[in-house]
Amino acid sequence: MFQMAKRAFLSTTLTLGLLAGSALPFLPASAAYADPDIAVTNKQSFSTDVIYQVFTDRFLDGNPSNNPTGAAYDATCSNLKLYCGGDWQGLINKINDNYFSDLGVTALWISQPVENIFATINYSGVTNTAYHGYWARDFKKTNPYFGTMADFQNLITTAHAKGIKIIIDFAPNHTSPAMETDTSFAENGKLYDNGTLVGGYTNDTNGYFHHNGGSDFSSLENGIYKNLYDLADFNHNNATIDKYFKDAIKLWLDMGVDGIRVDAVKHIALGWQKSWMSSIYVHKPVFTFGEWFLGSAASDADNTDFANKSGMSLLDFRFNSAVRNVFRDNTSNMYALDSMINSTATDYNQVNDQVTFIDNHDMDRFKTSAVNNRRLEQALAFTLTSRGVPAIYYGTEQYLTGNGDPDNRAKMPSFSKSTTAFNVISKLAPLRKSNPAIAYGSTQQRWINNDVYVYERKFGKSVAVVAVNRNLSTPANITGLSTSLPTGSYTDVLGGVLNGNNITSSNGSVNSFTLAAGATAVWQYTAAETTPTIGHVGPVMGKPGNVVTIDGRGFGSTKGTVYFGTTAVTGAAITSWEDTQIKVTIPSVAAGNYAVKVAANGVNSNAYNHFTILTGDQVTVRFVINNASTTLGQNIYLTGNVAELGNWSTGSTAIGPAFNQVIHQYPTWYYDVSVPAGKELEFKFFKKNGSTITWEGGSNHKFTTPASGTATVTVNWQ
């Protein structure tokens, strides 16, 4: 009962403060009144967080004694291909002086912390270094130019004390640049295990790497099984490599990291990544999101499939492209922005878990000399109040510019807290913790034309309404605006920083008003929930016996019931129950997709759909079929007797289409699949052309999977 009263008091206090026009203070997650769903200890959900992506080397040099020497280092940071000296101590210093807390960010996404190559590489007469962190050599040691293991632990401890989570970049796709015929080039892609050499790219007799040439990106298969540029590409079907990465990530999880950003997931087999994610969720589950680069706003079926089946979220490139087109490049309008919001909500099972952003280290920065500051500020406001987990690239708050690599990775120019962009972020970021409509809510368009977008976020009784006019010279008359805001007057959360105004709502309608040219305004209302309402379940995949976290509002203080489908979980299987968070053990039920519900005080919550229960621990198996000839339009698919193989379905849960170009060539087909460990599988292949299915004949193929590691099973078409 105390928990419910505390929530009601906090909600009422924050709402009244906003209606009075006062600024919302930053509420550190370690504060005594913080609820568990918004706390720094919640590693399974980042719905209430704002991420700040920092290139460690480019932020701040806090310890000059660990800087490189010689040709790898430029103290002036004028040569952006060399190390500039930024390190974890620099991040610690800015955590301690409250730069991040004052900005309102509650998670730092740092460069990959592992040991990178020490060699410099000459490309076209230009010396290159591994300052970016993506040329790894040992995934179980730190990059000494960033700091020691003790420094890294200090970074995590310091961040947590300030209510800030730490996300590490992690790149299991490759080591470093290598040439098959020249072992002296760079470090030959060598991989080390805590200082012990595992192997190099040349004379790779153990098959640790792929040797299929460089990718031309012409197909998904080509991108997975060929090298990304000249980077030594791992063969994850190798049992040694599989174990190496499952062990390596546990080392960083045991250090206390709160999240993982996985590099180049488009270039690693889904079957291995799902197995890897399962091992993470068994060990220490944390929020994980991957980089699947999309070059345009167009949807990609493989991208969507990965987001819905891999067990991790993605960086939302569709969001990024739409925002840049509308606010930066002026090549699209608000209808396209609204269309993106609607289409991604349909395509992604957990759209609120996708990580939204306006720029990063792999594209031109949002800000250029030709882009008005107000457009950047509006893009930030839109991102911070939209669905998804917002990520802000370092220096954006200082209007840092730069087109392409390496200019988009320049040194942090200043740490001013007085810029308008800093002010916008600092005012809007805390809403993710104070108003569940921003963290968990649905999105509904309320008023729109080419230049104006008014949208509403809603979760239970809590509401936020956002209005943006991108036209920098013409105000907009807003009439007939409907809203879920209760009757009353509402001040702009931004306090007029972006020329927003106050509004009055009466019986679901907002009085007509003028939205100034270039204005953005945010109005919000929060209220305590008296009925259970689920906002997030994380992770979204697990085996029976794993513990998952349910976040939301109105669960009460007395244990109720959690349902996975129709299976009720009660008693000791619910390890904790608070008004905003429940921790529950996955029951022993048949594997498959389930809707999760909560029942409290005789009332059922909304359904949180698409939770995946696995059969058990996972291993990766490569399924190969010979002599499978097809006609034009046909592809080969796989199905079998477990949920991971589609439970004999020929629909969307079947595996495929299989590949036939790189590892094996037509009429041999193959596919890497995450399947239950130590289990006898029965399976068959089939040909599919639209709705026409042609099964292979004979009895079911059978194969018993290993208890760990990887395997390959090869059969002939029957």
Swiss-Prot record:
This is Cyclomaltodextrin glucanotransferase. Ca(2+) 1 binds at D61, N63, N66, N67, G85, D87. One of its GO terms (molecular function) is metal ion binding. Monomer. It is an enzyme of class 2 (transferase). Ca(2+) 2 binds at N173, I224, D233, H267. The record marks D362 as: Transition state stabilizer. Residues 441-528 are annotated as: C.
